[in-house]
């Protein structure tokens, strides 16, 4: 951090354009509180800038990629939230995504797609024959494995195609590519890594698993068959089942059982992704959907979480829209159970704050404490929309009056009125927090 760091933040505050994008690395052990205060003040303006990155976790991510510590210190955010080593790291980030909502659906339908009615995945057994929750969880894990095997195979094909298409302009920005006359596409960088494999639907997975565990197996409030019938009907005529699903414990509320399940599932996912290697190295996991949670949701029917068919999946590591009811602190505690350092492509947390919070007298101090808590808990990233929901709804109805309204979508900022309606609806539906606690 130096004088230019403050100047860049001030320029962003004064100009308020959606490009160029702006991210900050913050290290509690190294950077002064005055810098954190300036970050908080700019965030409160509501432009979506800057995106905030926990420097210590960023370094850990580079170490987990095999980068030596003396160079990992020089990491930088690139793209949306991906971790990069400028001029030295070859890795196609966010190369392929896999759908965790589909994994749950396929486990409930023995490999079939609810939307298309075809066998879309492998058969993992009739769920009505499962005698324990563990059998159901294993079926979901096998569906995730199946998805990942296909995803990685597709990534390898893309690598083979890319190997035949050199990129000399890009290669000129890599020291070793120039020194050794070896193109970036051929692995000419100093550090060559497997491509990014990114999960979409974190909260959909966890909320669905815990709902089945509680409602079907632990408390026996509903049979598996009745749950399946309710999902087939998109809960129409099964409002009692919908109510039970909605009231089941939810990711993002610091529930101990949900937190433990989150840690277990995402250690499993990281382990499995890292078990695959390309010609450039082991594959690298991430959780950064950009806005892919919206089109991915169009492929997934109703889920045990209570989510209705074809609606957007949860974005990044954020809770499902409207289900985080215990405040921003509880969200952080839940998210901290994901091993962020192992998802070394990057992880993305969107937070929507009401203008009521921004206008409160202690908001800057409270936001600074929130960001410190994020760092202490080992969460990698967060970014904010500071706006009230009614303004977004009005902008959707009367776009001509809101041409300059900036929002943070995922790893990028955009003019709200230029977004598709589905993405606008997704942003509107996010929980709006009026306080930190």
For the regions a language model picked out, list residue spans one by one.
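Conserved catalytic cores of very large enzyme subunits
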Residues: 1-437
């Amino acid at each position: 951090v130096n004088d230019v760091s403050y100047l860049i933040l001030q320029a962003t505050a004064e100009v308020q354009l959606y490009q160029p994008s702006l991210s900050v690395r913050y290290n509690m052990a190294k950077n002064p509180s005055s810098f954190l205060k300036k970050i908080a003040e700019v965030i409160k303006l509501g432009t979506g800038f800057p995106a905030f990155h926990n420097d210590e976790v960023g370094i850990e991510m580079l170490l987990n990629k095999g980068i030596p510590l003396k160079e990992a210190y020089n990491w930088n955010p690139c793209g949306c939230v991906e971790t990069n080593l400028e001029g030295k790291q070859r890795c196609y980030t966010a190369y392929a995504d896999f759908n965790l909502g589909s994994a749950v659906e396929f486990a409930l339908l023995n490999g079939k797609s609810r939307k298309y009615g075809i066998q879309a995945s492998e058969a993992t057994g009739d769920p009505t024959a499962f005698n324990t929750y563990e059998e159901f969880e294993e079926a979901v894990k096998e569906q995730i494995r199946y998805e990942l095997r296909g995803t990685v195979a597709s990534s390898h094909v893309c690598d083979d195609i890319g190997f035949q298409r050199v990129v000399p302009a890009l290669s000129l920005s890599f020291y070793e590519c120039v020194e050794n006359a070896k193109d970036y596409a051929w692995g000419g960088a100093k550090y060559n890594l497997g491509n990014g494999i990114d999960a979409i639907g974190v909260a959909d997975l966890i909320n669905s698993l815990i709902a089945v565990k509680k409602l079907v197996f632990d408390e026996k409030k509903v049979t598996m068959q009745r749950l399946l019938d309710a999902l087939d009907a998109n809960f129409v005529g099964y409002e009692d089942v919908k109510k039970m699903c909605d009231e089941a414990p939810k990711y993002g509320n610091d529930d101990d059982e949900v937190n433990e399940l989150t840690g277990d599932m995402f250690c499993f996912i990281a382990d499995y992704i890292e078990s695959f290697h390309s010609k450039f190295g082991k594959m690298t996991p991430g959780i950064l959907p950009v806005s892919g949670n919206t089109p991915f949701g169009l492929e997934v029917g109703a889920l045990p979480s209570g989510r209705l068919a074809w609606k957007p999946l949860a974005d990044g590591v954020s809770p499902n829209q409207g289900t985080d009811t215990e405040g921003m602190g509880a969200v952080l505690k839940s998210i901290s159970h994901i091993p962020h350092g192992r998802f070394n492509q990057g992880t993305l947390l969107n937070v929507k704050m009401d203008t009521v919070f921004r206008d409160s007298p202690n908001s800057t101090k409270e936001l600074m404490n929130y960001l410190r808590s994020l760092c202490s808990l080992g969460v990698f990233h967060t970014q904010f929309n500071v706006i009230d929901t009614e303004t977004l709804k009005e902008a959707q109805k009367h776009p001509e009056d809101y041409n300059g309204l900036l929002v943070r979508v995922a790893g990028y900022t955009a003019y709200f009125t230029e977004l598709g309606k589905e993405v606008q609806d997704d942003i509107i539906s996010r929980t709006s927090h009026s306080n930190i606690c």
